[in-house]
Amino acid sequence: MKVYDCCELVRELYAQIGSGDQGYIPQAISCAVRALNEIAADTALPLAAREKAAFAAANLLISDFED
């Protein structure tokens, strides 16, 4: 997936990180898994959104990528 395929909010933050206005996280996969885990655990969110986040987090955890 390319940045231009992402939603406006993602593209805005991408530009801010690239310009130095927003902090870059070197351990990006761990950051993503933590964020997805928080979404998956949030019972105030719709179950469908939580399941998508849980699926994405599980796939990142099982992938070959490491921070």
Swiss-Prot record:
Pfam families: UPF0253 (PF06786). It comes from the Bacteria. InterPro entries: UPF0253. NCBIfam families: PRK04964.1 (NF003436). HAMAP family: UPF0253. Belongs to the UPF0253 family. This is UPF0253 protein VC_0872. It comes from Vibrio cholerae serotype O1 (strain ATCC 39315 / El Tor Inaba N16961).
